[in-house]
Amino acid sequence: MSNIISSNRPGSGIKWQWPSIHPEGRKFLLIAGIVTLCFWLLGWEILGWLMLGVTLWVGAFFRDPVRVTPASDDMIIAPADGLITQIAEVPPPPEIAGPDGLGDAPMLRVSIFMSVFDVHINRTPVAGTLRKLVYIPGKFVNADLDKASEENERQHFVVERADGVRIGFTQIAGLVARRIMPFVSMGSELATGQRVGLIRFGSRVDVYLPAGTTPKVLLGQRTLAGETVIARIGQAATIDGIGQ
């Protein structure tokens, strides 16, 4: 997909377009479509309508919309579409702690829960070099639970910025999600908002923010991967909000 440069300069504009389907989802869409067609050919109309709904949902699940990523070195961008369910200070995961990872000091963790209706393409929150990529097999408990960070199947990423600051994020499988797929490898040079992985069928992403980072999101806020600014590097005023 070609890059689209957006601007807020007078006279600039962009046309809406249908989101493409990620290649990983095309086989599922094809299978669902074939089953739907078979039901209709056999005269099983009720099942045909049900499978048509499933086919449309599969297409929506694997949609891969274009996102316009803010270009600023101090911004940390949401890696996932979803709902902010937790903002807490916690130790970094042991698999990516220590001097070659995120260190051992407590970090601010922002958790984003993705429902089965959200886009499930995940993106890197900052530009830099992928220093660690660690897959951990595990359980499939509800991804909205706190223990999912330690018990569920998960994939850890540690990205080091050009200034040496390291940021971690973790894809976590859930009750329905049974497959985590990274698109990148150790040592990859990543751009902010670049597609880095996919979790199939509902899950969560945790972001581990370094010291001196100010969160710019609130509990209950929705995010868009590659677009929503969730934090800024450096001290600044925190924000409050009202649910209404």
Swiss-Prot record:
It comes from the Bacteria. It is an enzyme of class 4 (lyase). It is a peripheral membrane protein. Its EC number is 4.1.1.65. The modification Pyruvic acid (Ser) is found at S203. InterPro entries: PS_Dcarbxylase (IPR003817), PSD-A (IPR033175). The active site is at S203. It is found in: Cell membrane. Belongs to the phosphatidylserine decarboxylase family. PSD-A subfamily. HAMAP family: PS_decarb_PSD_A. This is Phosphatidylserine decarboxylase proenzyme.
